[in-house]
Regions:
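A short, N-terminal "cap"/entry segment at the start of jelly-roll beta-barrel domains
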Residues: 1-40, 121-123
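Conserved hydrophobic/aromatic beta-strand scaffold that supports enzyme active sites
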Residues: 31-33, 44-48, 65, 85-87, ...
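Short, charged/polar surface micro-motifs in flexible loops or helix N-caps
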Residues: 39-41, 50-53, 74, 111-113
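Glycine- and acidic-residue-biased ligand/ion/polar-headgroup-sensing regions
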Residues: 51, 59-75
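Residue-level marker of beta-strand positions
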Residues: 54, 84-85, 103
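Short acidic-glycine-tyrosine-enriched beta hairpin
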Residues: 75-95
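Ligand-binding loop in jelly-roll beta-barrel domains
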Residues: 90-115
């Protein structure tokens, strides 16, 4: 099978230490966009929430997978703590908060409406 033509080489290495954190419209939330395919919506990002920061209630456009690296992410369904993983189905709604801060690796099949707007603005 031929490599994906999205890259000049068969692999694309992303040096996270050379990437700056990008502020988002949500106070206390920063992201590093690791991969985004506008044609399909596929998005991989690191997200960092300051202690007490949250994300306004939103609906997932498609499957989202989150691996919490540090801290915890809490919503009305429970808490996902460091070293753990949560999957959110298409159509699920929540308003997560990070009581003690949180750093997470997030995979979206399609970004939420708010993330889509942010990506369109070039963040």
């Amino acid at each position: 099978m031929a490599p994906d033509t999205a890259f000049a080489l068969a692999s694309r290495f992303v040096e996270l230490d050379t990437m700056a954190w990008t502020d988002t419209p949500n106070p206390g939330m920063k992201v590093k966009i690791l991969y985004h395919d506008p044609a399909t919506g596929l998005l991989t990002m690191l997200s960092k929430l300051a202690p007490g920061a949250g994300i306004p209630e939103h609906t997932h456009e498609d499957l989202e997978q989150t691996f919490v690296l540090e801290g915890s992410l809490v919503d009305d369904e429970g808490a996902c703590t460091a070293g753990n993983f949560v999957i959110r189905a298409k159509g699920s709604r929540h308003a997560p908060v990070a009581p003690n801060g949180c750093t997470m690796l997030v995979f979206f099949m399609k970004p939420t409406a708010a993330l889509s707007k942010m990506l369109q603005k070039g963040h």
